[in-house]
Structure formats: structure tokens, C-alpha cells
A protein has these predicted regions:
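Residues in well-ordered alpha-helical elements
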Residues: 10, 38, 71-74
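Short, flexible, glycine-rich and Lys/Arg-enriched loop motifs at helix boundaries
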Residues: 104-106
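Alpha-helical segment proximal to the catalytic Tyr-Lys
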Residues: 18-22
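Active-site helix of classical SDR
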Residues: 5-6, 13
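Catalytic Tyr-x(3-8)-Lys segment
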Residues: 50-72
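Rossmann-like NAD(H)/NADP(H) cofactor-binding core
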Residues: 23, 28, 92
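C-terminal substrate-recognition "lid" of short-chain dehydrogenase/reductases
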Residues: 66-96, 101
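Short, flexible catalytic-loop segment of classical short-chain dehydrogenase/reductase
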Residues: 31-43
């Protein structure tokens, strides 16, 4: 299901990029990986602060071996929004996931 959703986001992003590109409007998306936050804290951390089994599985599938930090998402958004650094970037989905989407598990 995740693959289908990711492909849907890519298709929509690319369609919007083509549709609005002639007007000078860029359309890009960010595909975040796993970030520890208040809403998922109990799923990822035990009462003593150690990782749950679920968190260990996520970390094992993330080549960088950790959860993302909010400022890493902010950096990606600022890059994509910048007319100086990304004025010719259009129609992409930028993974900010520590390599999770690239990892095959071997």
C-alpha cells in the first residue's frame, strides 16, 4: 500500500509540475522517513526510554541507523522553496528518510 501511495504522490507532483511549469510555478514534494515525535512516542519508546521492537526494526531498515530530526525536514523544504538553489528543480519527490527508501534489506 505504501508503494502505491508513494507512486500516487509522484504522479500528482509530476502532473502539477508539467501543468504549472509554463507559468513558472514549481511543484515538488517531500517524502519523510521516520521521525520520533509526541504522537508516535509510545510506539517507538518503552517507558524506560529504550527502543521498542518496532523502533528497532525501523532503525535496522534505515542505513543511517537513526530517526530523522525535524530540522532535516525543514532544510529540505527550504532548499525546494529557494529560487536560488532550486529554481530548476521541478516535479520531484525528495526522500528525507536516512536511506530507508533505498535500502533493500541485504
Amino acid at each position: 500500500m505504501l508503494v502505491l501511495q508513494t507512486q500516487d504522490i509522484l504522479n500528482l507532483t509530476q502532473w502539477l509540475a508539467v501543468h504549472f511549469g509554463e507559468s513558472g510555478i514549481r511543484c515538488n514534494a517531500i517524502a519523510p522517513g521516520f521521525y520520533a515525535a509526541e504522537q508516535n512516542h509510545d510506539l517507538l519508546f518503552n517507558a524506560d526510554g529504550t527502543y521498542t521492537d518496532r523502533a528497532r526494526k525501523i532503525i535496522a531498515g534505515t542505513p543511517m541507523g537513526r530517526f530523522g530530526k525535524p530540522e532535516e525536514l525543514i532544510g529540505a523544504a527550504l532548499f525546494l522553496a529557494s529560487d536560488e538553489t532550486a529554481s530548476f528543480v521541478n516535479g520531484i519527490v525528495l526522500p528525507v528518510d536516512g536511506g530507508y527508501s533505498a535500502y533493500s534489506g541485504v
